[in-house]
Amino acid sequence: RHLYLNSLDGKSSAQVTKGNFEITNIEAVDETNKRIFYTMAYPTPMDRNLFVTDFNGKKATQLTKGNGTHRVQLNDDYTKFYDFYSDLNTPQIVTVHDIVVDKKKNISTNLVKTVNESAKLKEKLTEYGYGKAEFMRVPNSKGDTLNGWMLKPANFDATKKYPVLFCNYGGPGSQQVANRFGAVSA
C-alpha cells in the first residue's frame, strides 16, 4: 500500500510513495507545509516507523529509528510527537520529540524527554524469569518465507526436549508476528 495524491475532481492522481514496503497508517496531513506523516512497515514487515514526505514524494524522511514498533501522536501544529515504542522483548518506552525543519526544509528530530521507561515492569519480568522471544523465518512448500516467533524458557537448555505449543496465523488483516511488546502471548 502506498500514498497517492488525487485532485478533488478525480481527474488527476499522482503516486507519492514507491518501494518494496507497506504504509500501514496515515498519521497526519499538514496541508500548510504540504507534508504527510505516515507509519510504514520498515525495516521489516514486523516493524513500524514514522516517516514524513512532501506532497510530491521527493523528500521522504524517517523520523523514528530502529527495529520495533513506534506508535506516535503528533501535536496540532506538527512540531512535536509522542513516541510509544516497544519491541518483542522491550516494554513500552514513551518519549517526546521535537520536529525540526532547517532552512533547506530538511526535517530531523530532537529527543526532548523520556516520559516512561517501564522500569518496574522490566524488573518484574526479570524477577519472574520471563524468557526472551526471538523471530524466526520458515519457508513453506510454495517457497514463500513465513515470519514467526519463538518463546523459550529463561533457563533454556538446547540439550533437553521441551513441549511445543504452536499457534497458527488467524487470517487476513490480523498480523500475529509483530515486533512489539505483548505480541508474544504464550
Residue ranges and their predicted role:
Residues I36, T61, M136:
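A broad, low-specificity signal marking well-ordered, structured residues that form hydrophobic/aromatic
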Residues R35-T39, F81-F84:
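Residue position within the beta-strands of beta-propeller blades
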Residues R1-Y4, P45-F51, N89-H97:
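Structural motif
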Residues T69-A186:
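Serine-hydrolase catalytic core recognition
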Residues D30-N33, D76-D77:
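Residue-level detector of Asp-centered blade-edge/turn motifs that repeat once per structural unit
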Residues R1, P43, N140-D144:
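C-terminal substrate/ligand-recognition segments
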Residues N6-D30, M40-P43, T53-H70, I99-K132:
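Multi-bladed beta-propeller domains
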